[in-house]
């Protein structure tokens, strides 16, 4: 015998190591595991660790050519999920040498690439990742970050205001540019291409970029404020995407946009590097995220996708609203909003944060609240998200009975009123409606908006809630 014993052995004999002390350089993962009936949780957790690192289903002789102890993932702790039958949180530690430096693509391919189709598991969800500083430092991260963006735009002490141009598809480039101009002239900081506006027959990208740039400069000249429009550079190839970003830079506009999940992390990181080198801000839309993160027991939680985006690079990212038409439970949302903005975030299970995360010097990302929000939500949004955020009202601007510019005026007046009231020490949660009503007295545009949307509510329970 040469010391190689062929055959199949239980994963837990090699990959379940409850005595393991995690290292500062390990990438730590928290998986929500639902094993098949009859599979013990230790075996399920060990299987996840094995299949997402060095293991396969049988012993192979080439295992003897390397040091498995150095390279294997380890399931080092298992907790039962309170209130759920047959669900466990399995904590897995991965040695840093398993991952290519500066590659979110490789990190995800390793950790979630194969294991989610594993037969011994009924369902699997990646709840959180701890990225060690040693790995964080291999990433450029956001092209500019929150402070540099404020300096570029010369806007301080309040959230920024945006608007997605609707109808999202079907407008000609000239009419699209007109809608952009009216919104920006009315007082918004940004307007936005919808995520599926790329380069379709009714509006080719180059025409849209030109008319939007014209709208931008006209609105800037009239208002004396710096304006931006998120020009969506997402395309079918990376080369085409960069070509669009180059054209945006040549036009002198401040910001471009990318759909990072449909476009992919490799494309996103390439674009983020281009944006830093050329002074462009980068707005990130999370189209397709709910396919991955909506189910509570299977997939990847958005806080992981948010961390991945901060590493890959983006200056803004959509992060739910807590109050509008799209998913977003308050404590969970605030948990990943902090992970986007702050340098250091403590473990806090009450907000779904499984690990303490130290971002060292990686710039922060502005969370974007968008989806079914309007002027009545302004006090809540100002209080929940604070100054370092972008509040985006699509229908809540363009749906104004008097048109786009008055819709923009209404939002800007409501925001300024809320910020002023907060700075005076008033309680936005308690007095929010009164603050908006007072502001209506000297803004007919706001009064008209308040009248239109006074009855609108989206009362559905959040699907993804904290474990009780």
Curated annotation (Swiss-Prot):
- Keyword Chloroplast among UniProt keywords: yes
Locate the residues binding Mg(2+): 192, 194-195
- Site positions (Transition state stabilizer) are 325
Report the cofactor remark. Binds 1 Mg(2+) ion per subunit.
Q: Which GO terms describe its molecular function?
A: magnesium ion binding; monooxygenase activity; ribulose-bisphosphate carboxylase activity
- Highest taxon of the lineage: Eukaryota
Active site per UniProt: 166 (proton acceptor), 285 (proton acceptor)
Under the heading NCBIfam families, the entry gives: PRK04208.1
Name of the protein this chain belongs to: Ribulose bisphosphate carboxylase large chain
Question: What gene, per UniProt, encodes this protein?
Answer: rbcL
């Amino acid at each position: 015998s040469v010391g190689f014993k062929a055959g199949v052995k239980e994963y837990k004999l090699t990959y379940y190591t409850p005595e393991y002390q995690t290292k500062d350089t390990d990438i730590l993962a928290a998986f929500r595991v639902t094993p098949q009936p009859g599979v013990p949780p230790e075996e399920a957790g060990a299987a996840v660790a094995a299949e997402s690192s060095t293991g396969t289903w049988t012993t192979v002789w080439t295992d003897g050519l390397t040091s498995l102890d150095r390279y294997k993932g380890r399931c080092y702790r298992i907790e039962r999920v309170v209130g759920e039958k047959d669900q466990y949180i399995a904590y897995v530690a991965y040695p840093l040498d398993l991952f290519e430096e500066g590659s979110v693509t490789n990190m995800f391919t390793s950790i979630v690439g194969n294991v989610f189709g594993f037969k011994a598991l009924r369902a699997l969800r990646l709840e959180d990742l701890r990225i060690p500083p040693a790995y964080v430092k291999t990433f450029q991260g956001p092209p500019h970050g929150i402070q540099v963006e404020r300096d570029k735009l010369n806007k301080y002490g309040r959230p920024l205001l945006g608007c997605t141009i609707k109808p999202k598809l079907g407008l000609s480039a000239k009419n699209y540019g007109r809608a952009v101009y009216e919104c920006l002239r009315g007082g918004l900081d940004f307007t936005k291409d919808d995520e599926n506006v790329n380069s379709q027959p009714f509006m080719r990208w180059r025409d849209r970029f030109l008319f939007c740039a014209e709208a931008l400069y006209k609105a800037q000249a009239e208002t004396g404020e710096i304006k931006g429009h998120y020009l969506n550079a997402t395309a079918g190839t990376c080369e085409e995407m960069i070509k669009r970003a180059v054209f945006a830079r040549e036009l002198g506009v401040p910001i471009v946009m990318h759909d990072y999940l449909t476009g992919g992390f490799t494309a996103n990181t390439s674009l983020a590097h281009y944006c830093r080198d050329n002074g462009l801000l980068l707005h990130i839309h999370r189209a397709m995220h709910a396919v991955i993160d909506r189910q509570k027991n299977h997939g990847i939680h958005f806080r992981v996708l948010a961390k991945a985006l901060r590493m890959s690079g983006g200056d803004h990212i959509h992060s739910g609203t807590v109050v509008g038409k799209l998913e977003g439970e308050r404590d969970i949302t605030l948990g990943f909003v902090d992970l986007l903005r702050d340098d250091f975030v403590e473990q806090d299970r009450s907000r779904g944060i499984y690990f303490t995360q130290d971002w060292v010097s990686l710039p922060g990302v502005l969370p974007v609240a968008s989806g079914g929000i309007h002027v009545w939500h302004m006090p809540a949004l100002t209080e929940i998200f604070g100054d370092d955020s972008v509040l985006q009202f699509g229908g809540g601007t363009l749906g104004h009975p008097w048109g786009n510019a008055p819709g923009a005026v209404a939002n800007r007046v409501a925001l300024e009123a809320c910020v002023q009231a907060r700075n005076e020490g008033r309680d936005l949660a308690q007095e929010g409606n009164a603050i908006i009503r007072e502001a209506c007295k000297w803004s007919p545009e706001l009064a008209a908006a308040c009248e239109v949307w006074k009855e609108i509510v989206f009362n559905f329970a959040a699907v993804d809630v904290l474990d009780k």
